[in-house]
Structures are given as structure tokens and as C-alpha cells.
């Protein structure tokens, strides 16, 4: 029995309003979409993507593909990109100087 089944069995009578998903992986937008779609179908509840991030690859292109898609899904109610601290790594929303948005920060801010 998986953890989801154990939780749902033990939570008899609980009111669950939404489920929370995290995603960290390479820049494969279709994999991200498939993961969240399967997650939603598994629980049949609205999804809050409270953490997601790109661990390798082109974060700019990834965000350009997934942000409009998430906005178009009525079952995705919230989302938050995880890597916000100042960094020279182009997978963070804040530039190294801490004074401006990185390229993906600008994409996220205008989505």
C-alpha cells in the first residue's frame, strides 16, 4: 500500500481541499506537465505547486512553456518557483547582485 492510500484510509472523514506538489528536475516541460496532470488525476483535487525548479538545462525556455500552461489549468490554483535567492546560477529568480531580477525572474514576473 502506498503512502497516499495509507493516508487516505487513515483520514476517513477528513475534508481535503487541495493537494500540494513539488517538482525539481531537468528542463523537460512535457515531463512537468505529465507529472502534475497525473498528480491531479491521482487525488482528484485542486493542486498547489508550492515548489518547482529546474535543476539542469534551459530554465528560461522551461518557464516560458510551463507558466502559461499552469495558468490555463483550472485545477492548478497556486504555484511558486522555489529558487529565489541572489545567485550567478541562471536557475534563480534574483541576479547575483541581489538588486534585480534574473532572466527567469523577469519571465516569472511577467507571466
Q: Which role fits each region the language model picked out?
A:
Residues 1-5:
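Conserved small/polar residues in nucleotide/adenosyl-binding loops
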Residues 6-9, 34, 38, 68, ...:
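Charged/polar, solvent-exposed surface patches and flexible loops
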Residues 7-20, 67-77:
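Structural recognition of alpha->loop->beta junctions
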Residues 13, 41-44, 110-111:
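Non-catalytic accessory regions flanking glycosidase/transglycosidase catalytic cores in CAZymes
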Residues 21-61, 71, 75:
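Glycoside hydrolase catalytic-domain groove-lining segments
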